[in-house]
Amino acid sequence: MKHIRNFSIIAHIDHGKSTLSDRLIQECGGLSDREMAAQVLDSMDIERERGITIKAQSVTLDYKALDGETYQLNFIDTPGHVDFSYEVSRSLAACEGALLVVDAGQGVEAQTLANCYTALEMDMDVVPVLNKIDLPQADPERVADEIEDIVGIEAADAVRCSAKTGIGIKDVLEVIVAQIPPPEGDTEGPLQALIIDSWFDSYLGVVSLVRIKNGILKKGDKFKVMSTGQTYNADRVGIFTPKQTDTAELKTGEVGFVIAGIKEIHGAPVGDTLTHAKHGAEKPLGGFKKVKPQVYAGVFPISTDDYESFRDALNKLSLNDASLFFEPETSSALGFGFRIGFLGLLHMEIIQERLEREYNLDLITTAPTVVYEIVKTSGDTIYVDNPSDLPAINNIAEMREPIVETNILVPKDYLGNVITLCVEKRGVQKNMVYHGNQVAITYELPMAEVVMDFFDRLKSTSRGYASLEYNFVRFEPADMVRLDILINGDRVDALAMIIHKGLIRTKGLALVNKMKELIPRQMFDIAVQAAVGSQIIARSSIKAMRKDVTAKCYGGDVSRKKKLLNKQKEGKKRMKSVGNVEVPQEAFLAVLKLND
């Protein structure tokens, strides 16, 4: 046991976590040079293309240290994006220490802080590593001071390395052995294993990544999942060296996988505890908290025949992604689909992309909404995540919107722009601290404003230097109303949105004009209106296409032309009473892109 080290790598986006893990694997001979691909652990196509890590992955390596001993290193590569912070907390629950990787050119960013605090809250040892020292703009001294100043951990003698060129990788490994404590646990005691992650393999069933806290799990053991009480046989156990390698047993302190031929998707929920079926542990391990979705959107398959396969795809995905929440929903405009809860807009994009790629579905998404707390006049409190579930205006006593506390780190040159943005988004400033060249500002902002496009706007006003992390604090009373779009007097439920009272004129007008561009002209006039309750606040008409019926008249009396024009008018009127308007797919997406 004293030769095992479990650690994860935490860092901000693009500070080089995945490249560093590649180097560690190479240094310890986990893969031959031929098998090395850049970003070995980013196994999904989307991860490679966007250059971000989404899923945590684990690897077991053997390292012969300078003291002559061989150590088993289990490390977990974690995502750095704010939407995936629950992945990070999950990986940390399985470790004793973390490497905090900081780009020696960029310095500390908000996400570095957020993940680092998560680690410190769990009483873990955080070891700073300065990466990218080969860059001309690298300034390790300044960054070391920044780490001590902003994060508050010793960094004067932090290891300096360059994952790209391989300088200092040996030192990183030595620091891991020296500074990260070995796991504690009772080998003789009853088995307790924490499920860090699970995914569905169409041949093997559910594959679970586990960290053994106490006891030993042998191949062929009967074990039970503590939350469901189901028992299974461990058909195969083993480790990833990144390749899947079978072993005879997993001992206390080790991280590895278990395959038990579990076929139902929720057989081994993430964060659960495994123990032996006979003489098992009494109580489960305290893992990590379940995350609540922050943003909801309706997602519908473009062809209704895909509904069943869409449901299967969601089931399989939710096994791998503990934070996904979904329930069936119907819409008069879009048919059958699901209301899905996401952690943020990036998460929503990724899930939609994974569904479209991995399961070949064509999907359409409605505008994302956050959860509102509503006090009805009858005194009941309800939570609404869908604009069409909103009670009538006269039944609402008070509407409360979720407020998040946002911590933003920004270089002081861009401070003005960022403050202007926060004010425009109805933010309230709580705190501002200068750290050298960086400024840390804390704002309370409505979550609805943050999830829509705040992240992109923040990046563009600060030329990409600002970084943010946010967490929910409370519900606060607000003047929110539902904006409906009516087409020829009929409400289109998929276009409704909940917005602040001060924005209804501008938003309503923008939306109506956008619809006017996107809905194709018909043979009759179409009225597009934006309404709040029964009050119409904006309108525009899409003019009818008409045939020139008087073209064949040559000379003759004017009453002849009038007759033809009146006949055409009658026809249009009749057509309007029976015609219905097809709203194209782009129109639904326009709601998302209103601010462009």
Curated annotation (Swiss-Prot):
GO CC terms in record: plasma membrane
Compartments, record wording: Cell inner membrane
Domain tr-type G: 2-184
Topology within the bilayer: Peripheral membrane protein
UniProt-listed InterPro entries: EF-4 (IPR006297), EFG_III/V (IPR035647), EFG_V-like (IPR000640), EFTu-like_2 (IPR004161), G_TR_CS (IPR031157), LepA_C_sf (IPR038363), LepA_CTD (IPR013842), LepA_IV (IPR035654)
SUPFAM superfamilies the record matches: EF-G C-terminal domain-like, P-loop containing nucleoside triphosphate hydrolases
PROSITE patterns: G_TR_1, G_TR_2
EC number of this enzyme: 3.6.5.n1
Class of the enzyme per the UniProt entry, highest EC level: hydrolase
Pfam families: EFG_C, GTP_EFTU, GTP_EFTU_D2, LepA_C
One MF term in the entry's GO annotations: ribosome binding
CDD domains per the UniProt record, alphabetical: EF4_II, EF4_III, LepA, lepA_C
Alphabetical keyword list: Cell inner membrane, Cell membrane, GTP-binding, Hydrolase, Membrane, Nucleotide-binding, Protein biosynthesis
A Gene Ontology biological process term: positive regulation of translation
Residues where GTP binds: D14, H15, G16, K17, S18, T19, N131, K132, I133, D134
Gene3D superfamilies according to UniProt: 3.30.70.240, Elongation factor 4, C-terminal domain, Elongation Factor G (Translational Gtpase), domain 3, P-loop containing nucleotide triphosphate hydrolases, Translation factors
Statement: the UniProt record of this protein carries the keyword Manganese: no
Record's catalysed reaction(s): GTP + H2O = GDP + phosphate + H(+)
Similarity-based family: Belongs to the TRAFAC class translation factor GTPase superfamily. Classic translation factor GTPase family. LepA subfamily.
Function: Required for accurate and efficient protein synthesis under certain stress conditions. May act as a fidelity factor of the translation reaction, by catalyzing a one-codon backward translocation of tRNAs on improperly translocated ribosomes. Back-translocation proceeds from a post-translocation (POST) complex to a pre-translocation (PRE) complex, thus giving elongation factor G a second chance to translocate the tRNAs correctly. Binds to ribosomes in a GTP-dependent manner.
Record's protein name: Elongation factor 4
Organism, as annotated: Shewanella woodyi (strain ATCC 51908 / MS32)
Source organism phylogeny: Bacteria, Pseudomonadati, Pseudomonadota, Gammaproteobacteria, Alteromonadales
Gene behind the chain: lepA
